Curated annotation (Swiss-Prot):
Pfam families according to UniProt: Abhydrolase_1, Biotin_lipoyl
Catalytic activity: N(6)-[(R)-dihydrolipoyl]-L-lysyl-[protein] + acetyl-CoA = N(6)-[(R)-S(8)-acetyldihydrolipoyl]-L-lysyl-[protein] + CoA
Role of this protein: Dihydrolipoamide acetyltransferase involved in acetoin catabolism.
Cofactor note: Binds 1 lipoyl cofactor covalently.
UniProt entry tagged with the keyword Acyltransferase: yes
InterPro entries assigned: 2-oxoA_DH_lipoyl-BS, AB_hydrolase_1, AB_hydrolase_fold, Biotin_lipoyl, Single_hybrid_motif
UniProt protein name: Dihydrolipoyllysine-residue acetyltransferase component of acetoin cleaving system
Length: 374
């Protein structure tokens, strides 16, 4: 005879990170059964075809059951574990687990296709993602050789309170390979026209690496379009840069050549997956991409130095500024964070590299939410 299923049971399910995620692999549990869990505590590691990340507790409670085990490959929304108070019996949990049915990932590919949109800006086809429906917009700008998926762990956590938009810059991702220019000012101007085309009057602008330089330049050149600025390992706060990365990224033609270059981005080189490398190589082999990246690299990092310093002009912008760095950044030295403008919030994650928005996603998201809320 089945027991009554308690309404106090809280499921832990496979999250959906990014627009195209369909399944994840359980790597390891980070807590034991019987542990008292607080909201947001990382409780298990999951790997996708992009990168690994920690699943956070959706609520507070006691971890009563680990349903998924290390090595399990499960679809989005599959049951991973159960939180429940002590008064819930093991039999009730057994019945809950047995009765749980993984919900359909509603539109799946159709949903992802709807979330990806395209705009024509100056004759350049630009792919972008838009989620949420908040009154204020948060615009994400990726770095050299990246794309909007560099923010796959950061968009959904903000979409409940904001409209979030991330674009592929010209010459990147699925946007046209034709560049809008090779200076930060030219790219910032292009982003402003992208905002015009997509109906964004003003936005909180979040930029990573080269995209951080673009965000800073936009705040300097068009302050009326920028509500606040958040920068992750940005260019523009000093002239040092590892040009071996940019040159190596452009020249790599095989997985063997690309792997050691991409590993420079992360404190944990094990995060670089075969799928990640294959996706990058597929992008690099598109007509016009190598030429675009070569021109961009020479324009911004020619001679092995950063050519522009908009970050040092942010102090006069009057904008609220967040600067985030990885202490193990091998591309742009974390010491550049010391050049952040007076009054800026500065955070250095000691155990992260150049991609702290991915490596320290949960901590980064909490920091960004606080920054956006003022």
């Amino acid at each position: 005879m089945a027991t009554e299923i308690s309404p106090t049971i809280i499921p832990i399910v496979m999250p959906k990170w990014g627009l195209s995620m369909k399944e994840g692999t359980v790597n390891a549990w980070l807590v034991d059964e019987g542990t008292e869990i607080t909201v947001g505590l990382p409780i298990l590691d999951v790997e996708t075809d992009k990168i690994a990340n920690a699943v956070e507790a959706p609520d507070a409670g006691t971890l009563r059951r680990k349903v998924a085990q290390a090595g399990d490959v499960l679809p989005v929304k599959a049951l991973l574990g159960v939180l429940a108070p002590a008064e819930v019996s093991d039999a009730q949990i057994d019945d809950y687990v047995a009765a749980y049915e993984t919900p359909a990932d509603d539109a799946g590919e159709e949903d992802a296709a709807a979330a990806y949109q395209f705009a024509d800006v100056d004759g350049i086809r630009v792919r972008y993602a838009r989620k949420g429906g908040g009154a204020e917009t948060v615009l994400f700008i990726h770095g050299f050789g990246g794309d909007l998926d560099n923010w796959l762990f950061n968009l959904d956590p903000l979409a409940d309170a904001y409209t979030v938009v991330a674009l592929d810059l010209p010459g990147h991702g699925q946007s046209s390979p034709r560049l809008a220019g090779t200076t930060l000012a030219q790219m910032a101007g292009f982003v402003a026209r992208f905002m015009d085309e997509t109906g964004i009057e003003a936005a909180h602008v979040v930029g990573h690496s080269m995209g951080g330089g673009v965000a800073a330049q936009l705040a300097v050149d068009a302050p009326q379009r920028v509500l606040s600025v958040a920068l992750v390992s940005p260019v523009g706060f000093g002239d040092a840069v590892n040009s071996g990365y940019t040159e190596g990224f452009v020249s790599a033609q095989s997985r063997r050549e690309l792997k050691p270059v991409v590993e420079l981005l992360f404190a944990d080189a094990g995060l670089v997956s075969r799928q990640m490398l294959d996706d990058l190589l597929r992008y690099k082999r598109l007509d016009g991409v190598t030429e675009a990246l070569t021109a961009l690299g020479q324009g911004l990092f020619g001679g092995g130095r950063q050519s522009e310093q908009p970050g040092q002009r942010l102090a006069n912008s009057g904008k609220r500024v967040l600067v985030v760095w990885g202490g193990q950044d091998q591309i742009i030295p974390a010491a550049h964070a010391e050049a952040a403008p007076p009054g800026a919030t500065v955070k250095v994650f000691a155990d992260a590299g150049h991609m702290s928005q991915m490596e320290k996603a949960n901590d980064f998201n909490a920091l960004l939410k606080k920054h956006l809320g003022g």
